[in-house]
Regions:
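Short helix-coil boundary/hinge micro-motifs
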Residues: 1-81, 86, 157-193
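A generic structural motif
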Residues: 12, 122, 135-136
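A residue-level signal for conserved active-site and pocket-lining positions in enzyme catalytic cores
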Residues: 13, 89, 147
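Histidine-centered nuclease catalytic patch
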Residues: 82, 102-130, 139-155
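Short helix-to-loop capping/linker segments positioned immediately adjacent to catalytic or ligand/cofactor-binding
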Residues: 86-88, 99-101
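Short metal-coordination and nucleic-acid-contact micro-motifs, chiefly zinc-binding Cys/His arrays
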Residues: 90-95, 124-128
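Short cysteine-rich clusters marking metal-coordination/redox-active sites
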Residues: 97-100, 132-135
Length: 193
């Protein structure tokens, strides 16, 4: 079994991102962990001390706050609108085509620009929906009005908590509980969990 990713926070408790267990151990070894949370402990063993013969051990929890990882203005900018990729877009939209309402696997889905790029539309969360290939082909490079099509749901920009949930398919229960505390009541993600 592989070790799950660790949820890294700033000292104020704002989620920063997912890190590997190796990164978490490094933060511990350098004394950069401000505090820890979560119910899951992971113990890692290193080499043996020449002086004492004892084996080194570092324990980390599933959620750690890292010194110097303060979000501040930079973090606010990063999480204002996170980068879009197809996998996260499809997960945000729950694999549901915005036009026909059918659920598909990733290989049958496409990214559709509600307002076409050729007409000045942006590649941003609020201008993107998940569409099956036939519906995207039918809409083509036209506006909804010109294509005589309607959206079944409204796109939205995920907040940092939603974004981190969308990024990781193997979230531990304590990590999910922490992240769900920052997910808005109206979010589609709440309907899944």
């Amino acid at each position: 079994m592989s070790t799950p990713r660790i949820l890294a926070l700033d000292r104020g408790g704002n989620p920063w991102g997912w890190i590997t267990w190796e990164d978490a151990v490094t933060y511990h070894a350098k004394g950069l962990v401000a505090w820890e949370a979560g119910e899951s402990d992971f113990e890692f063993h290193g080499g043996h001390s020449r002086m004492t013969g004892e084996r080194s051990t570092i324990t980390t929890q599933s959620i750690i706050a890292v010194k110097g990882m303060d979000l501040g203005k930079l973090g606010a900018k990063i999480f204002k609108e996170p980068t879009v990729d197809n996998e996260l877009l499809f997960r945000r939209d729950r694999q549901l085509c915005a036009y026909c309402g059918n659920i598909y696997g990733d290989d049958k889905l496409t990214r559709d620009h509600i307002f076409p790029v050729s007409m000045g539309g942006k590649d941003k969360w609020m201008n993107l929906v998940t569409a099956c290939r036939p519906c995207n082909h039918r809409k083509a490079d036209r506006t909804l009005a010109n294509a005589r099509m309607e959206l079944l749901y409204v796109p939205y920009v995920p907040n940092r908590y939603e974004y981190l949930i969308l990024q990781n398919r193997k979230i531990l229960a304590d990590q999910m509980e922490f992240l769900m505390s920052g997910v808005p009541e109206h979010s589609r993600i709440r309907k899944e969990h």
